Amino acid sequence: MPEIDMKPRSRDVTDGIEATSSRGMLRAVGMGDEDWEKPQIGVASSWNEVTPCNLSLDRLAQGAKEGVHAGGGYPLQFGTISVSDGIAMGHEGMHFSLVSREVIADSVETVMMAERLDGSVLLAGCDKSLPGMLMAAARLDLSSVFLYAGSIAPGWVKLSDGTEKEVTIIDAFEAVGACKAGTMSQEDLTRIEKAICPGEGACGGMYTANTMASVAEALGMSLPGSAAPPSADRRRDYFAHRSGEAVVNLIAKGITARDIMTKEAFENAISVVMAFGGSTNAVLHLLAIAREAEVDLQLSDFNRIADRVPHLGDLKPFGRFVMNDVDRVGGVPVVMKALLDAGLLHGDVMTVTGRTMRENLEAMDLADLDGTVIRKMDDPIHATGGISVLHGSLAPEGAVVKTAGFDLDVFEGPARVFERERAAMDALTEGRISKGDVIVIRYEGPKGGPGMREMLAITGAIKGAGLGKDVLLLTDGRFSGGTTGLCIGHMAPEAVDAGPVAFVRDGDRIRVDIAARTLDLLVDEAELAARREGWAPLPPRYTRGVLAKYAKLVHSAAEGAITG
C-alpha cells in the first residue's frame, strides 16, 4: 500500500523555492518552520450575527481549530454566507434562500481550491448552509468533517386566557394567520413573538436544519451523536474539538468525502429522514449532494425506502416534540441503531471516525427507543416513511408531499390558481379561499421564481385561518420544514418550463391519492393541447444580479435544483 501523503495539496504553497512568497504570507498569519510539514485544514464557518442559528459557530470554530492542532494539523479559518429563512420568509428575500446553498458550496470550493488546503471542517447552522457545506465536501472529495451549530431551546409562553405552552418559530407564522382571522389578539401575538427564540441555535423542531443535521450524521459525515445536542450545550465544544482531530485522522487514513458518501450512505440518510418524518427539503438537498458526490440518486429511491421504513418521530411541526427531546432520549444514534437492528440500514459504510457505522454504534452505550418521542418499531406513527414522491398528469417528473402530516388519503377539489405566493396570500386575507379548494401557486419554481421560495407564510396563514385540514395547496415552489397542512410542492416540470401546472385554470378538478402516490389534473388532453397553443411563460422577474444568473443555470427540482 502506498504511503499516505499528509499534504496532498498544500505542498503547492509550502515546498520549494517557488513557494517563497506564499510561505512568507503564511508566516504572517502565524505559521512557522515547524508547521510546513503539517496538513493545512480549512475551517469553514457560516457564522454571522443576522440570526440565532449561527451564533455558536464562532465558538465552535475555535474548538475545531484546537482539535486540528491537537491532531497534528494546522487550521486556517475562513467564512462564508448564510441566509436566515425565518427572517427571509414571506417577502422578496426568500428568492435568495435556495440560491445561497449554491453560493455557499461555490465559495467553499473556491477558497479550498485556491489556497490548496488539504482537508476541511465545515460548520453550519441554517437550513441552506448545511447542504451547501455537504455539497462542497462532496464536490472537493477531500477529507472533511461536518459540524452542526445545534438547535435552539423551545420557548414558553403564557397567553391572555391563562394557558401556557411551548412554542417555536413556526408558532409565530401560524399566530399571524390566527390574528388576521380574528381568532387571536395582537397582545397574544406579541407574547408569542417574544417567546419563540429564547437563545442561540437553529429552529428547534424537525424542520430543515435539524433534518439536515440528522442527514449529515446518518451519511457518516458528522461524528456520532453530534446532531442532537442543543447549541448552547458544552457537548458541542467537545464535538468541535473531536471534529478537528478527526479530519487529520481521515487524511492519515486516506479517507475522503466520497469514500463516505456512497449510495448506501445516502440510503441510510433517507431512512433516517423517513423515520423522523423530516423536512421535504431533504429530498431536494440529498439529490443535490449526491450529484456532487457522483452518486446516482433518484426520486424513486425515496419511495422505495419509504415503503419499508416506518415513521417513528412524534416531532414538530406535526408532532409534539423538538430536537432537544430527541437529544434527551439518545439522539440520532438511538434511531440508527433501531433501524440497523431491523435490517433497514447499511452498517458497513465508512464514517468520519475512520470506522464503519456499525462499529460506531456498537461502541456507544445506547438506550432503546423511548416509545414516546421516538415510537417503537412495532408501534409506529405510520407504517411507511414520512415523505412520498407523487407522479401523475399534473407532475410528470414528480412532486413531494410530507405524508407524516397529510391526514387524508384522497383529496379532490376545484383549482384556485395564483401567479406567485403574494396573490394567494391576498386572496386568503380577503376571504376568497373556501373549504375544499385546491390552491395552485405557480411561477415559484427554481427557474420561474426564481429561487423556489418556501411557502411558510401562506401555509401558516391557512392554518391560522382554520383551513389547514380543508384546503389543498400545490406549488412548483417548496415548503419550509416547519410547514403543516395539506401541502404538495416541488411540482416538476415547473410552470416556466411549460409543465402542466402552467395550464391549470380556475375550476379545474385536481385529485391527489396519497396511497397510490398520484397527482392528477382531471382535464382531457385535447383541452390541455388547446391551452398550450400560443402559450408563453411569464417574463423573467430578474434580469441582472445573482438571481438572473441562477435562473439561467438551475435545473429542475426533480434533479435537486442544482446549477452545475
Curated annotation (Swiss-Prot):
It holds the Pfam family ILVD_EDD_N. The active site is at 480 (proton acceptor). GO terms for biological process: isoleucine biosynthetic process; L-valine biosynthetic process. Binds 1 [2Fe-2S] cluster per subunit. This cluster acts as a Lewis acid cofactor. Its EC number is 4.2.1.9. It catalyses: (2R)-2,3-dihydroxy-3-methylbutanoate = 3-methyl-2-oxobutanoate + H2O; (2R,3R)-2,3-dihydroxy-3-methylpentanoate = (S)-3-methyl-2-oxopentanoate + H2O. Keywords: 2Fe-2S, Amino-acid biosynthesis, Branched-chain amino acid biosynthesis, Iron, Iron-sulfur, Lyase, Magnesium, Metal-binding. Pathway: Amino-acid biosynthesis; L-isoleucine biosynthesis; L-isoleucine from 2-oxobutanoate: step 3/4; Amino-acid biosynthesis; L-valine biosynthesis; L-valine from pyruvate: step 3/4. InterPro entries: DHAD_IlvD/Edd, Dihydro-acid_dehy_C, DihydroxyA_deHydtase, DiOHA_6PGluconate_deHydtase_CS, ILV_EDD_C, ILV_EDD_N, IlvD/EDD_N. The keyword Zinc does not apply. It is an enzyme of class 4 (lyase). [2Fe-2S] cluster binds at residues 53, 126, 203. GO terms for molecular function: 2 iron, 2 sulfur cluster binding; dihydroxy-acid dehydratase activity; magnesium ion binding. It comes from the Bacteria. Its cofactor is [2Fe-2S] cluster; Mg(2+). PANTHER family: DIHYDROXY-ACID DEHYDRATASE DAD, DIHYDROXY-ACID DEHYDRATASE, MITOCHONDRIAL. Homodimer. Belongs to the IlvD/Edd family. This is Dihydroxy-acid dehydratase. It comes from Clavibacter sepedonicus. The lineage of its organism: Bacteria, Bacillati, Actinomycetota, Actinomycetes, Micrococcales.
